[in-house]
Amino acid sequence: MKRILLAAFFISNILYSQEKIIDTVQGTKQNLDEVIVKGIRAKFSSPISYSNIYKEKLKNKNLGQDLPILLNFLPSVVTTSDAGAGIGYTGIRVRGVSPQSTNITINGIPFNDPESMGTFWVNLPDFTSSVQSLQLQRGIGTSTNGSGAFGASINILTDNISQTPYAEISSSFGSFNTRKNTIKFSTGKINDVFEFSGRFSKIDSDGYIDRAFSDLKSYFIQGTYLKGSTLIKAISFAGHEKTYQSWYGLTMDQLKENRRQNPYTYENEIDNYKPVS
């Protein structure tokens, strides 16, 4: 019995000594895309109703209308447009709650007006072209920005780094003399460290409502430094909007006569605003 046990022990040692470790990644280098982790986004296990929308889906719908209009296919979402064409002054309600109770963040930074808690999408024409992904949370969610998140939260992440250079020109045309022209570019990774990208857009529309034209311009510029585990981004974006006011309502008689009426109060009733972020 002792001889059998000794032989078995000897054989097991021999088999173990024959194992060889093979390193399949030795001498190779893998460059991975950036990953931005945001604690204010809900996960699958979170007890929150939410929808994730990615660039591919937004790109198919992005023909010049404001971002809220592109989200009107989501559950519990209702959108509004002063000019009636989805361009200019637009709004979004989630579960019927006031837009002032919908918290908007861009790269984790609150975008709501700090006084009124409103979000003026007219100041972000064609911002959809610079969005990588967004998450809409219905009801109270994971936002850290207080009362502005009672109704809903929309968390927006802007474009990722492009590994390769590109240049893109796109144009679209639609009803009510609506036109969108966009130029986008990226240098790609320079010396495997730097990347610069940008977008310039011009949108025009006569609007569905009488005289409710929109003349919109915007830009988005991004500079990135990426080395090792260090990622630094500098982002600037702004819009310039000229819109004829069309927020007054109509009586039932006016609606029956001409649904496109726009009450006249004074000459050249135009909003001309140019904020910078």
Which residues does each PLM region occupy?
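Bacterial Sec-dependent N-terminal signal peptides
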Residues: 1-22, 32
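Short, glycine-/polar-rich solvent-exposed loops and beta-turns at beta-strand/coil boundaries
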Residues: 28, 77-88, 109, 115, ...
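Transmembrane beta-strand segments of Gram-negative outer membrane beta-barrel proteins
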Residues: 30-34, 131-136, 152, 158-173, ...
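N-terminal periplasmic "start-of-domain" segments of outer-membrane beta-barrel proteins
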Residues: 31-64, 91
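Extracytoplasmic beta-strand/coil segments of soluble accessory domains associated
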Residues: 68-110, 132
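Outer-membrane beta-barrel architecture
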Residues: 69, 93, 135, 155, ...
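Short acidic/polar hinge/loop motifs at secondary-structure boundaries
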Residues: 110-138, 157
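Transmembrane beta-barrel wall of Gram-negative outer-membrane proteins
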Residues: 166, 173-204, 209-257, 275
